[in-house]
Amino acid sequence: MLDLTYELPKPKVIAGAKHDWELVIGMEVHAQVSSNAKLFSGASTQFGAEPNSNVAFVDAAMPGMLPVINEYCVEQAVRTGLGLKADINLWSAFDRKNYFYPDLPQGYQISQLYHPIVGEGEVLVELGDGTARMVRIERIHMEQDAGKSIHDMDPSMSFVDLNRTGVCLMEIVSRPDIRGPEEAAAYIAKLRQIMRYLGTCDGNMQNGNLRADVNVSICRPGAYEKYQETQDFSHLGTRCEIKNMNSMRFIQQAIEVEARRQIAIVEAGGEVEQETRLYDPDKGETRSMRSKEEAHDYRYFPDPDLLPLEIEQAWVDDIKSKLPELPDEKKARFIKDFGLTDYDASVLTADLESAHYFDAVAKGRSGKLAANWVINELFGRLKKDDKDITDSPVSPAQLGGVIDLIASDAISGKIAKDLFEIVYTEGGDPAQIVEERGMKQVTDTGAIEAALDEIIAANPAQVEKAKENPKLAGWFVGQVMKATGGKANPKAVNQLVAKKLG
C-alpha cells in the first residue's frame, strides 16, 4: 500500500430547511467478468452481436439442460478478490434467486447469497485533494446476468435479446462507508482501475459492463459516528436503492437529488420508504420503481443442479503469485524510485497502458524529466488529437531518445519540442533527425559570444537599462536564442550575458 498519510475527507453536508444532514452511501457494483464464455455455458460473450446469436441451450432454459461452471470465471473472481485485499472462501455455493421477468428465461437467477466466493476486503479511495477513505468491501459473489428487453423497435410489441443472459457478473458489495457523491464516483473509478490492471473486467460503462446500484440514506451529524461505534443501523436513515447506474456523472447527480428528496420528506414529518428507484437525468429526479425487496421475497434456496464450489489454497496462492503490480503499489514505487509528486504519479498510474509507457521511458533516465514529457507533451498532444496512449505515434524508445538528447545537452528545450513534433507527425529516430536537420545545440561559446556582441553593439540603450536593472538582461538572452534559431545552449548564453552586462 501507499506509504503516505492521508486525512479523511469531510462528509457531504446538505442544508435542509430545518437542519443540516449528512449522507451515507453503500454500493453494489456489477462488473462483467472478462471471459470469452458465459458462467455456465460455452456461448460467446461478444458485445454487439446479432440479437439472440450468442445463446446456448442452457441460457435459453431448454428442458434438461444443466449448467456447467466456467473455471476461468471462478479464477477471475478470485483474482479480483485478491486485488481488493479480500478473503477468498475455499468453499462457496450457488443459490437460486426466484423472480419472473421476460428476459430471464429460467424464472430464476443463479447467484451466491449464502456462501459467496469472496469475503471482506478494502479499497483505498483517494479524492485528489490529499484526502482518502478506506472503503470496506463486504463480499463479492458471482451471478448470471439477465437478458435485455427492447421496447423501441415496434409500437405494439417488446422484444427480448438473450445474448447477455448467463454472462458472468461479479457483484461487489461495499459497506456504507461512502459519505458523498464525489466519493461514490471516486470509489467506482478506483474499482474500475484495479479490475483493469487485473484484467478481470474492462470497466466499459457505456456497454453496461460496469454498473452500480447505489444505496442512499441521510442522517443528522454525529449519527454516523454512533453507527460506527455500535454497528447499529438504527442510527442511520432508511435507505433507498437507485438501480442500474452506468455513468459516474449520473451517479453523483442521482445521489444529490435522492438525498434532497429524503430530506424534504423527513423535515415535513414523513417517513422515507425503503424502495428501489430509478434516476431520470432529463428531469433531474428519482422515481419509484418498486418496493425494496428483502432476501425472503426471492425465495432463495441452494441450486440443486450445482455442487458446492470447492477450490484449493494452493490454486489461490498460485493466482496471487501472478498478480500484477496494482495501482497503489505502482504509484508508491513511482513516488519513491523516481521522486514524482503525488499528482504526477496518480496521472501516470491512472491506467495500465500509461504506467507501462512511463516505466519504459523512465528506465535509466531522470524520472522527473520523463514524467514531465509524458504528461505535459505527449498526453497534451494526444488529447489535442482525441487519442489515448494506446494510439500514440511516439514509442517509449522515441520519447526516451528525445529526453536523452536533452540530458546530454545535444539540444535545447525549445528544439526538443520542435523535435518531438517531428517525431510525432513523421516518425523516425530522434538522434538521426537532429543530425540530418542540423538541430544540434550550439555549445561553442565563441559563436554565442559573437552573436551576443553584435546584439550589444546594436542596442546601446538596452545595455544601459540592463545595467541599471539586471532583470532586463533576459531580453539579451532571448535575442541570442532568436539569432541562433533556438540552438544556443541557454546556460552558456545566460553566463555570457551576466559576464558582459555585470
UniProtKB/Swiss-Prot annotation:
<comment type="subunit">
    <text>Heterotrimer of A, B and C subunits.</text>
</comment>
<dbReference type="InterPro" id="IPR018027">
    <property type="entry name" value="Asn/Gln_amidotransferase"/>
</dbReference>
<dbReference type="InterPro" id="IPR014746">
    <property type="entry name" value="Gln_synth/guanido_kin_cat_dom"/>
</dbReference>
<protein>
    <recommendedName>
        <fullName>Aspartyl/glutamyl-tRNA(Asn/Gln) amidotransferase subunit B</fullName>
        <ecNumber>6.3.5.-</ecNumber>
    </recommendedName>
</protein>
<keyword id="KW-0648">Protein biosynthesis</keyword>
<comment type="similarity">
    <text>Belongs to the GatB/GatE family. GatB subfamily.</text>
</comment>
<dbReference type="GO" id="GO:0050567">
    <property type="term" value="F:glutaminyl-tRNA synthase (glutamine-hydrolyzing) activity"/>
</dbReference>
<dbReference type="Pfam" id="PF02934">
    <property type="entry name" value="GatB_N"/>
</dbReference>
<dbReference type="InterPro" id="IPR017959">
    <property type="entry name" value="Asn/Gln-tRNA_amidoTrfase_suB/E"/>
</dbReference>
<dbReference type="GO" id="GO:0070681">
    <property type="term" value="P:glutaminyl-tRNAGln biosynthesis via transamidation"/>
</dbReference>
<dbReference type="GO" id="GO:0050566">
    <property type="term" value="F:asparaginyl-tRNA synthase (glutamine-hydrolyzing) activity"/>
</dbReference>
<dbReference type="InterPro" id="IPR023168">
    <property type="entry name" value="GatB_Yqey_C_2"/>
</dbReference>
<keyword id="KW-0547">Nucleotide-binding</keyword>
<dbReference type="InterPro" id="IPR003789">
    <property type="entry name" value="Asn/Gln_tRNA_amidoTrase-B-like"/>
</dbReference>
<keyword id="KW-0067">ATP-binding</keyword>
<dbReference type="InterPro" id="IPR006075">
    <property type="entry name" value="Asn/Gln-tRNA_Trfase_suB/E_cat"/>
</dbReference>
<keyword id="KW-0436">Ligase</keyword>
<dbReference type="GO" id="GO:0006412">
    <property type="term" value="P:translation"/>
</dbReference>
<dbReference type="InterPro" id="IPR042114">
    <property type="entry name" value="GatB_C_1"/>
</dbReference>
<dbReference type="Pfam" id="PF02637">
    <property type="entry name" value="GatB_Yqey"/>
</dbReference>
<dbReference type="GO" id="GO:0005524">
    <property type="term" value="F:ATP binding"/>
</dbReference>
<dbReference type="InterPro" id="IPR004413">
    <property type="entry name" value="GatB"/>
</dbReference>
<comment type="function">
    <text>Allows the formation of correctly charged Asn-tRNA(Asn) or Gln-tRNA(Gln) through the transamidation of misacylated Asp-tRNA(Asn) or Glu-tRNA(Gln) in organisms which lack either or both of asparaginyl-tRNA or glutaminyl-tRNA synthetases. The reaction takes place in the presence of glutamine and ATP through an activated phospho-Asp-tRNA(Asn) or phospho-Glu-tRNA(Gln).</text>
</comment>
